[in-house]
């Protein structure tokens, strides 16, 4: 097993989680809905193409790209319709990613603070965390691309989270499932672990400074080593 996370976690004071595809299992839902809605307005996309283009990107970027490629005008409520479709689909089968609760219990035991910093809106993040029963664990520790002027892959969101919780960037550990998220962590000067337990191919996360893990509980093993 890669020993780099073990060494880095000795100095970690804050773990920053992405939400979709790391804490909650939404990355199999969102791309299918985006593909359907983009196709409806004249830009045919598959879920796999959506993942490659938009994984980890803020919703504002998604909207601008669909608007630029659509053959019919997007109504002002397009993004709201997308959010509602994702919310309804996730509500029908809310799931955390495997190992999430065990890892959070482990971090609580070690008294190691954690937060979530996601490209989704506050409404979407809080709905996902509420549906999966995680919301109380992240009270006052939810950060959204809505909070900053530039979303991932810019470092702004991660730096905002670290600053808000009083942690120097070098002592944060980012857990991400998207190339854009890993790019944002690197730009922020934060160590990053790539998580490939969802649909993300490990190869696209290979630039994560601390390697790629297929299971969140591997962080427990490396942290305890």
Where are these regions (language model features)?
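Short beta-strand scaffold positions
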Residues: 25, 116, 175-176
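Asp-based, Mg2+/Mn2+-dependent phosphohydrolase catalytic module
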Residues: 1-13, 105, 121-225
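Conserved phosphate-coupling serine/threonine residues in phosphotransfer and NTP-handling enzymes
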Residues: 22, 118-120
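N-terminal helical cap/lid subdomain that shapes the substrate entry/recognition surface
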Residues: 3-110
